[in-house]
């Protein structure tokens, strides 16, 4: 038995009553190296986890507490799963020296001005922003390993960046504009009641939303520029899908499929959670549901000098809680796949 199994890292979750918080609890409960010590959910403080999430009843999790009730002694890691703006207000109150993985948007953007422009909120934690590491695991693994504040990516951003960043880094994509078509399940909008995501509004139809002004554009612009050393103009067309989970991205490219496929295969050959499908095979969201895997497919256009790259992931796992656990594994020098090798749920 390893030392970490005998003496697991004590972790806490701040923001345990949302979908991401629930998935963090589920994943941590069966993780070989982490022990869930406390879960903060101010609105539900004093309640048992099973009162809010009956499906977690069997896990014997700690009751919800308030942030003021937190005990920081002996904590090795904090996951913060609060909404943007709220997250930074809480994180600045956490004692110095704590390792933190933040799942909000508050520390993803390197530019404070860009954050305030896209999110309409004042950024109040400039010193923390300066040391934050963008948490796209397979791209920034070395920085994540040394980091103390990891800013997990947006789910839509992750699904887009995984197929495109290698092509930019390797100089395969040379044009300065990209069109990104995306479909996302309703859980990406969070757990709070909103008219536009209730069953009667979403089922039996697909509709675009936030076309040209989705906040994840800021992340994409930032990361595309870092990978290519130039500004890439983005046309981003997200659609709300009548399903709970999943993100699917399709991006047309003026490149032959064989070149795109080979580049991605080589780039991700040592990445256990990024699966490059056989060329011409199309990925589907149901094939990654409930898992930490991202499937990427490359298909030829009728014009052989063009292709389409398609990626899928589960927004709550690889796009959020699973990504956070994977980053935590790297921070503590555990096996990258620890606690994350569950197969997708199908059908």
Predicted stretch roles:
Residues 197-293:
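Contiguous C-terminal substrate-recognition/catalytic subdomains in enzyme active sites
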Residues 8, 133, 177, 233, ...:
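A residue-level signal for beta-strand positions that form part of recognition/binding surfaces
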Residues 2-204, 209-211, 229, 299-302, ...:
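N-terminal Rossmann-like NAD(P) cofactor-binding subdomain of oxidoreductases
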Residues 18, 84, 130, 157-161, ...:
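Electropositive phosphate-/nucleotide-binding environments in soluble metabolic enzymes
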Residues 40, 65, 137, 181, ...:
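Residues in well-ordered beta-strands of folded domains
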Residues 249-347:
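C-terminal active-site/capping subdomain that shapes the small-molecule cofactor and substrate pocket
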Residues 25, 161-165, 217-221, 265, ...:
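Predominant activation on well-ordered alpha-helical scaffold segments within soluble catalytic domains
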